[in-house]
């Protein structure tokens, strides 16, 4: 049995507050050796392990009543090596380090992470384990910046993985949903520090559609916040710069009063009278951005790169994010726009805002690109690896093109359907999320692994309940679609999972893995 100290009666709750767990034991190992010991002990005791970091996944994928492991004490920098002639550096860190801690270290060295998502609270291991991404026509999954990984597999073996050492296991571990092993260290490729110069425009929804074919490749970093009842969008575009910082844009809901007022309005519209929702959106939009359409000559801000990448996620929320081919984006947005409007007319359901619309380019060259002529503000990635993870949910048919030739045909469109939980109160999501998922599915989309996708009883595997026996927000599962979508890649992932974890040490919360096709029910002896 493990000699590592543990806590009993610990309650884990995810950031959104939707799910909680009271594990039998809660561990915080302080070294890689302790992680190895812990996995071996769990195997001998026939216990399962789940690793958690910041708990930002809004789903129940990390819920367990057995052993829970947190790597926050594995937060040291192991090595930092600069390659000035190639204009990058490689930093090797413990996998429990949070991104904001890594950002602080890199900033002091004059370097930056190349691309990030909307927050920096995740751990180095956690951010790649479910396929996290930023929003750029040139950059792909965050994992493409990782040069190598060291994991402890289910046999308690320490394994070093990269494109040359166990490349197939590497491709499984780059997006593992926690089922291949515990990532204990990683090497990340970083670039000389840069600021982001951004413009923020208010445009109509119709103008967004008119600009669709050229808009997404107009800046290195780009995202849209869609307000369907207001029929307006906020278009944010950013590029690297060495200009001096002048701070972020002002935010009404970034103030204590604005934030409280918005959450109160959401509570009233969800708990007392739902048809108020469109009016709440219009009021909040006008307070945050004003009534008039603004051009790109309006709000211009220069911030550090991390402030440019990150955004205020506001309140506890259900999030259902899917990615589909950008070429299908016009059809998707028109369909969703019509459905949202009709649902409001019929008082069937209402959506919350902003709906975040983003893109990525997960196409990969056959080999790493020449970086010898880059500058601090050169666009595009310096790849840590050119391996596509087996469980990458982005379109697999897109083909790599040099930056100057990138079009929508290389891109993945991401849409976030977000429903807030004002003051921690659950809000109905099933009607809206089901329609959203069906729309994205028809357009060739797949869900983000960490989010609150629902699926259906007809798509799940293993035992299912009657539809009426599920909670409104309860996941039904997507196993049959997952098998169809991922095909041979899923078969390879399952084979590697079984080889690396023959005793199912990392199969806590088996139900989540079964209903979503990560494992075949026949793999389990029980």
From Swiss-Prot:
Cross-referenced Pfam families: ALO, FAD_binding_4
GO MF terms held by the record: D-arabinono-1,4-lactone oxidase activity; FAD binding; myosin V binding
Keyword Transport in record: no
SUPFAM superfamilies xrefs: FAD-binding/transporter-associated domain-like
Residue span(s) of domain FAD-binding PCMH-type: 19-193
Subunit field text: Monomer.
Protein name (record): D-arabinono-1,4-lactone oxidase
Organism, as annotated: Saccharomyces cerevisiae (strain ATCC 204508 / S288c)
């Amino acid at each position: 049995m493990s000699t590592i100290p543990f806590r009993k009666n610990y309650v884990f709750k995810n950031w959104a507050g939707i799910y909680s767990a009271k594990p039998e034991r809660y561990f915080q190992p302080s070294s890689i050796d302790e992680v190895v010991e812990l996995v071996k002990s769990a195997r001998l005791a026939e216990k399962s392990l789940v690793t958690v970091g910041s708990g930002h996944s809004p789903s129940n994928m990390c819920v367990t009543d057995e052993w829970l492991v947190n790597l926050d004490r594995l937060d040291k920098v192991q090595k930092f090596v600069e390659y000035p002639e190639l204009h990058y550096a490689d930093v090797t860190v413990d996998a429990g380090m949070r991104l904001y801690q890594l950002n602080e270290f890199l900033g002091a060295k004059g370097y930056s992470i190349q691309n990030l998502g909307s927050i920096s609270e995740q751990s180095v291991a956690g951010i790649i384990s479910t396929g996290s991404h930023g929003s750029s026509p040139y950059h792909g999954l965050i994992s493409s910046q990782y040069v190598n990984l060291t994991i402890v597999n289910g046999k308690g073996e320490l394994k070093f993985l990269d494109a040359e050492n166990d490349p197939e296991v590497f491709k499984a571990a780059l997006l593992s949903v926690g089922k291949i092993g515990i990532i204990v260290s990683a090497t990340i490729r970083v670039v000389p520090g840069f600021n982001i110069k951004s413009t923020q425009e208010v445009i109509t929804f119709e103008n967004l559609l008119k600009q669709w074919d050229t808009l997404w490749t107009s800046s290195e970093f780009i995202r849209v916040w869609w307000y369907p009842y207001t029929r307006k969008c906020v278009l944010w575009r950013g590029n690297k710069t060495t200009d001096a910082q002048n701070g972020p844009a002002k935010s009404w809901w970034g103030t204590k009063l604005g934030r409280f007022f918005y959450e109160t309005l959401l509570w009233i519209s969800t708990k007392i009278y739902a048809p108020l929702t469109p009016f709440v959106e219009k009021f909040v939009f006008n307070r945050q951005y004003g009534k008039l359409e603004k051009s790109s000559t309006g709000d211009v801000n220069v911030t550090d790169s991390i402030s440019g990448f990150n955004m205020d996620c506001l309140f506890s929320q259900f999030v259902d994010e899917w990615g589909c081919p950008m070429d299908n984006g016009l059809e998707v947005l028109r369909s969703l726009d019509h459905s949202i409007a009709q649902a409001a007319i019929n008082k069937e359901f209402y959506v919350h805002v902003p709906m975040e619309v983003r893109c990525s380019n997960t196409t990969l060259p056959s080999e790493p690109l020449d970086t010898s002529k880059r500058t601090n503000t050169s666009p595009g990635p310096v790849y840590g690896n050119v391996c596509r993870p087996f469980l990458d949910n982005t379109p697999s048919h897109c083909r790599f093109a040099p930056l100057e030739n990138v079009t929508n045909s290389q891109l993945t469109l991401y849409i976030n359907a977000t429903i807030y939980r004002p003051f921690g109160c659950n809000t109905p999501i099933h009607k809206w999320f089901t329609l959203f998922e069906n729309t994205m599915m028809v357009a060739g989309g797949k869900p983000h692994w960490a989010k609150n996708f629902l699926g259906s009883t007809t798509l799940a595997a293993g035992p299912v309940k009657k539809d009426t026996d599920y909670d409104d927000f309860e996941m039904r599962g997507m196993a049959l679609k997952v098998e169809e979508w991922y095909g041979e890649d899923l078969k390879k992932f399952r084979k590697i999972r079984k080889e690396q974890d023959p005793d199912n040490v990392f199969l806590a919360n088996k139900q989540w893995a079964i209903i979503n096709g990560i494992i075949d029910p026949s793999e389990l002896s029980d």
